[in-house]
Amino acid sequence: MSGKPPVYRLPPLPRLKVKKPIIRQEANKCLVLMSNLLQCWSSYGHMSPKCAGLVTELKSCTSESALGKRNNVQKSNINYHAARLYDRINGKPHD
């Protein structure tokens, strides 16, 4: 018997894959603008000149999103890196 502790390895898998990677999503810009506009209207009254800037920003934001100019959904790259580094994680035997 040798004094070495046993080496624990991952079970043999065809590939290492994360099923549902978590991706951070940014807040919808149009939703934030609409909230600010409604708050402005509740403070200063409907169609107040102080809120005119928010109205134009909200209109431009909604027209851009209607035309499809919004950002594409960002895909997670965790599975790419897991596949790339699987041999290092698994620890192939050196014998």
UniProtKB/Swiss-Prot annotation:
One of its GO terms (biological process) is mitochondrial translation. The keyword Ribonucleoprotein applies. It comes from the Eukaryota. Pfam families: CHCH. A motif (Cx9C motif 1) lies at residues 30-40. Disulfide bonds join 30-61, 40-51. Residues 27-69 form the CHCH domain. One of its GO terms (molecular function) is structural constituent of ribosome. InterPro entries: CHCH, Ribosomal_mS37_fun. It is found in: Mitochondrion; Mitochondrion matrix. Keywords: Disulfide bond, Mitochondrion, Ribonucleoprotein, Ribosomal protein. GO terms for cellular component: mitochondrial inner membrane; mitochondrial small ribosomal subunit. A motif (Cx9C motif 2) lies at residues 51-61. Its main location: mitochondrion. Present with 259 molecules/cell in log phase SD medium. Component of the mitochondrial ribosome (mitoribosome), a dedicated translation machinery responsible for the synthesis of mitochondrial genome-encoded proteins, including at least some of the essential transmembrane subunits of the mitochondrial respiratory chain. The mitoribosomes are attached to the mitochondrial inner membrane and translation products are cotranslationally integrated into the membrane. Component of the mitochondrial small ribosomal subunit (mt-SSU). Mature yeast 74S mitochondrial ribosomes consist of a small (37S) and a large (54S) subunit. The 37S small subunit contains a 15S ribosomal RNA (15S mt-rRNA) and 34 different proteins. The 54S large subunit contains a 21S rRNA (21S mt-rRNA) and 46 different proteins. Belongs to the mitochondrion-specific ribosomal protein mS37 family. This is Small ribosomal subunit protein mS37.
